[in-house]
Amino acid sequence: FEDQLEAAVNKGADHFGGIDICVNNASAIQLTNTLQTDMKRYDLMNQINARGTFLTSKKCLPFLLKAENPHILNLSPPLDMNPKWFANSVAYSIAKFGMSLCVLGMAEEFKEQGVAVNALWPRTAIATAAVKNILGGDETVKVSRTPEIMADAAYVILTKDSKEFTGNFCIDDNLLA
């Protein structure tokens, strides 16, 4: 897996002449309580969410360090330790907060080199396939916002000066207000 990711990053950098932005959007989700979460699913969520974010960022960083306005953007929640975020989905919360911890640590680690590392999270559900297929079907999609709000918010973050805007945990509509 690591070799495949490195090859993909290198191929992309070769094709486009470098890497300016790394968006860690891939995610595995299962909103089950502790007793309902099997370890295979727990491992999958942590491998994709936390480990995948760390590894993808790590492999992109040599290219980002050469870019003019380099950004890493993780789609992960603010580091809010309120137990309500963990109560019914401990495994998923651990995996997503792992992505957020990458923001906290990498933002500080690469601040002096000018690589911005930030997080973006939606205030409410976004109408995606995951929401439809896993979180509640068509009824949930009907009351969800469209993905464009996240795209617009990501654009705002990724066009900011990387030397000045790093280590932030942004909520989509706050950023666009």
What are the residue ranges of the model-derived segments?
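Conserved amphipathic alpha-helix within the SDR
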Residues: E2-G17
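Conserved Rossmann-fold SDR core element
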Residues: G18-D20, S100-V103, F110-P122, E164-C170
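Substrate-binding pocket helix/loop in short-chain dehydrogenase/reductase
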Residues: N33-T34, D38-L44
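A short, exposed helix-loop element centered on a Lys and neighboring polar residues
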Residues: S57-K58, L104
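Catalytic loop of short-chain dehydrogenase/reductase
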Residues: L65-K66, H71-E112, W121-A125
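C-terminal helical subdomain
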Residues: A119-L120, G137-A177
